[in-house]
Design a protein with these regions (language model features):
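The feature captures the short pre-catalytic strand/loop hairpin that immediately precedes
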Residues: 245-246
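An alpha-helical repeat/solenoid feature that recognizes helix-turn-helix modules
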Residues: 1, 12-117, 125-235, 249-283, ...
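TPR/TPR-like (Sel1-like) alpha-helical repeat modules
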Residues: 240-241
Length: 313
């Protein structure tokens, strides 16, 4: 409950966590996304104390509005933007945001479906022929190398395909390939775990994507056929236990404090089989009224003409 009260107090507290974007690098929307997902899951689990139900609902509405207001022109979200003009979306930030909005919509919150559609567009446009997903959506400048090689993209492919799949824009084969790519190229993630620097060559993998990737591949596994899930879960479990610290925590950075983040992401990954995915996104179809029969139209026209004729006195 103490953690919940902290979220209620700080999640959108200005200026540090308010609406907007400061400078070129602003990670506040990561906090908004994770706070939204956390509160929605607490509602689903019926874990919100009675006296906090209204504040939680109000904060969820505010977080949704904040994400909507922070949308990049053209769709999606990114924590790194240009000061000189339009910026591309970040698929690995946009996908978790979309998943949280899917869950909010499932629970009855009002969501602008246009924002979801635009976000899905940016993820889909970042998908390359190889199955890799660009670091930032820019299909006109795709190279398929470095960031965009399967090795460089393997930690964001699963979350991208998961969001696209629930949005009706992916397939089982694509999801399966994203999970396979994570395992096939895991060694490149491990080489960057708990290392200095950020986007170092050859594949420019930053250390802090390590446990992020494990969490979202765990979620994507839930879309696989039942007979494939158990094998994939065991494979993931072995990898997670392989990188567990002697203290019993998980950390993908060089800072002791980040063990909190790594451990939390790992625990969420381990709980994925018991955590329902958001409901599939189905845009509300606005049905146009059926045309009136010909005789009704003629009758209406005649009545209209009669009313418009001048009255003789």
């Amino acid at each position: 409950e103490r953690g919940l009260r902290f979220l209620l107090k700080e999640s959108v507290q200005a200026p540090r966590m308010g609406v907007g974007f400061n400078g070129r690098y602003d990670v506040r929307d990561w906090g908004h996304i994770e706070a939204l997902e956390t509160l929605l899951r607490m509602q689903q689990l019926d874990r919100v104390p009675t006296d906090l139900e209204t504040p939680v609902k109000n904060l969820i509405t505010t977080l949704i509005k904040t994400l909507e207001e922070n949308e990049i022109k053209g769709g999606g979200w990114n924590y790194s933007r240009s000061r000189r003009g339009a910026s591309p979306a970040s698929p690995f930030m946009t996908a978790p945001a979309v998943l949280a909005l899917f869950r909010a919509r499932e629970l009855g919150y009002d969501i602008d479906t246009g924002i979801i559609e635009r976000a899905l567009d940016t993820i889909e446009n970042a998908r390359l022929e190889s199955g890799a997903v660009q670091y930032s959506t820019n299909p006109e400048r795709a190279t398929g190398e470095g960031f965009e090689a399967l090795e460089g993209a393997c930690a964001r492919m699963a979350v991208s395909e998961l969001a696209l799949s629930l949005g009706g824009r992916s397939s089982l084969d694509r999801v399966r390939f994203s999970v396979k790519s994570f395992f096939d190229h895991w060694k490149w993630l491990e080489r960057r775990r708990a290392q200095t620097g950020t986007h170092n060559p050859p594949f420019y993998i930053a250390p802090y994507y390590f446990f992020y990737g494990h969490l979202h591949v765990a979620r994507a596994i839930e879309l696989l056929p039942k007979e494939e899930q158990e094998k994939a879960r065991l494979q993931l479990l072995k990898l997670l236990w392989q990188v567990r610290d002697p203290e019993g925590t998980w950390n993908d950075r060089v800072f002791p404090r980040s063990a909190c983040y790594g451990t939390a992401m790992t625990l969420l990954a381990l709980k994925s089989p018991a955590t329902p995915l958001p409901a599939e996104f189905k845009p509300v179809e606005i049905k146009k009224p059926l045309p009136k029969p010909k005789e009704e139209n003629e009758k209406a026209e005649n009545e209209k003409a009669e009313k418009s004729e001048p009255v003789s006195l």
